[in-house]
């Protein structure tokens, strides 16, 4: 696949589940159709938002297969394959390739983080198992390691099949240093929804995030205008978008369940324990007010 397809606004797709916790193929198909209709540039599966680490290898394989089939090559698919063990991550990478995904991604070692060499040994095993473009997932909030941008960049560029990185951090200075060292050899996707326009100034070619499940069209519209020089569009939109995030992030899955049902007639189901919803009951008027806020703020 052409490297230039890895850009733009990608929802970190939610994984609809049935009451018994099994992924719901029908609702997944409906969500894929809705996101493509709304203009998603690609779909990122089975990450934190998609509850990937809480699903079995069998379930993750099925979700990947169903999504690839539903997308039918209309948008690229990136499957997150990070798991508790390197062996499981490698197996999931093979499954993603066999299912027809266009790229793979993975967080670093979950729970066990000895040093930077162990992190990149984990990545190396994943990247070498198939020929798909590989996008390691750097999640700054969960990393206990410190390293310089130069050290990180050198190890990143040495990985097999590396094409980019999902970089989830509020530190855009650090992101800019990474971009300055790696240039176009590493395509950076920002993972901080609340900074997706700001991240473009630090070298991000796109954004992958939870809130694009609801507002991919609006965010794509504003980002496109911003990149063409319409700074006022971003200045108007970003505070509204940040407000919407701030009042819903404490119960993100509960909010998404109500909002996606209202907007797309998609039921994502409940969360998988130990992940829980917070508020549980969102009034339609609350959600409608946020829909109106974002629509008005995104008008160019």
Where are these regions (language model features)?
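Active-site beta->alpha loop and helix N-cap motifs at the rims of alpha/beta catalytic domains
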Residues: 2-144, 154
């Amino acid at each position: 696949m052409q490297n230039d397809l890895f850009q733009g606004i990608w929802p970190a797709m939610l994984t609809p589940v049935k009451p018994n916790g099994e992924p719901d193929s029908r609702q997944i198909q409906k969500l894929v159709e809705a996101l493509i209709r709304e203009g998603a540039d690609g779909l990122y599966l089975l990450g934190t938002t998609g509850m990937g680490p809480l699903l079995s290898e069998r379930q993750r394989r099925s979700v990947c297969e169903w999504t690839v089939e539903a997308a039918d090559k209309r948008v690229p698919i990136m499957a997150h394959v990070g798991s508790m063990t390197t062996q499981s991550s490698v197996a999931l990478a093979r499954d993603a390739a066999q299912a027809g995904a266009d790229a793979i991604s993975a967080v670093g070692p979950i729970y066990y983080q000895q040093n930077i060499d162990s992190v990149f040994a984990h990545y190396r095993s994943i990247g070498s198992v198939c020929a798909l473009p590989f996008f390691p997932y750097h999640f700054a909030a969960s990393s206990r390691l410190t390293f310089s941008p130069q050290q990180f960049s050198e190890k990143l560029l040495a990985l097999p099949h590396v094409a980019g990185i999902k970089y989830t951090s509020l530190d855009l200075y650090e992101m800019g240093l990474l971009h300055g060292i790696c240039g176009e050899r590493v395509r950076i996707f920002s993972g901080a929804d609340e900074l997706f326009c700001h991240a473009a100034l630090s070298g991000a070619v796109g954004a992958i995030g939870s809130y694009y499940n609801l507002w991919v069209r609006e965010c794509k519209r504003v980002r496109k205008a911003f990149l063409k020089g319409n700074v006022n569009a971003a200045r108007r939109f970003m505070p509204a978008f940040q407000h919407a995030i701030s009042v819903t992030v404490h119960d993100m899955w509960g909010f998404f369940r109500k909002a996606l049902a209202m907007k797309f007639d998609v039921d994502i189901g409940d969360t998988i324990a130990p992940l829980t919803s917070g508020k549980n009951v969102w009034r339609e008027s609350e959600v409608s007010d946020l829909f109106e806020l974002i629509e008005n703020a995104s008008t160019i």
